[in-house]
Amino acid sequence: AILSSNGYFSATYFMSVVTLSNNFIDCLYTMASYYGNFVAIKGINERLIRMIDKKETEKPLLISEDQNKVCFEHVSFGFPNKESIFKDFSFQFDKGKKYAIVGDSGSGKSTLLKLILGYYSIQKGRIISFDKEPVIIRQEEHLFSGTIRENLCLGEKFSEEDLKSAMEFANISDLDLNQFVSEDAGNLSGGQIQRISIARAKLHCHNLLLCDEITSSLDSINTEKIESNIIELTDKTIIYVTHKIHKKMLQEFDDILVLSHGKLVEHGSFEDLLSKKNYFYHLFMNQ
């Protein structure tokens, strides 16, 4: 957090390193009992080192702030020794609009967000983004040992009004900003951890907000509240990955992308996709 506040790297970049560090530590705890974890630890450690050493200019993204879009142009991507996830994938996300991405498990939804973040280098094509520091909320987020305030601010300065607004947004107004978060956030529930992470993203997001299954650990009341607040972010570009097809929520999106095995099989508004009675219709009816 101190390095972040001094401008060495962004808060978003810092949290990516924290997430990988926590994964590395978790593997260390079980290494004595499970030798197989050694391979996982080695891979995570190598990836962590690459991320720390990696310069911003080395990200596999073309940043063009005057483009007002996030554009995939004939993108192909896959992991080594595995079948490609995306082949000649093209789509344009316009600045200021809200997009939902749905599809079966393994369809490439989360990978698409990671490509926007520049986590992976693509094999072909190019990705253009208007935002050099998009913010992501993941399905499982990590908090570090410190106060809730410190976890929200990450070394940056925010007014009390901004903090209050973010906490109301994530429905955590009942928590004390000075409450201490223990190691591994053991004194908080999974839902509280996720809502603190959502509040943190609200504080740090300037333009592009990426959401990856962010309500999976929340109860129905908090889910409805936060989904409603996400929709009301009129000054943000939202790309929202979900496996839950909630009619009330998805009706508010400008466009819904339906992925299957890395392919965009259809897209459009909620009503248009239902009326076609194709892939989206069957996802909705069979959930």
What are the language-model segments listed below?
Residues 141-183, 279-282:
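Conserved "ABC signature" C-loop
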Residues 102-104:
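The feature captures the beta-strand-to-loop junction immediately N-terminal to the Walker
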Residues 52-97, 126-129, 232:
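Primarily ABC-family ATPase nucleotide-binding module
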Residues 48, 275-287:
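C-terminal boundary and immediately downstream tail of ABC-type ATPase nucleotide-binding domains
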Residues 117:
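Helix-to-loop junction immediately C-terminal to a conserved catalytic motif
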Residues 148-151, 180-275:
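ABC-family ATPase nucleotide-binding domain "signature/switch" substructure
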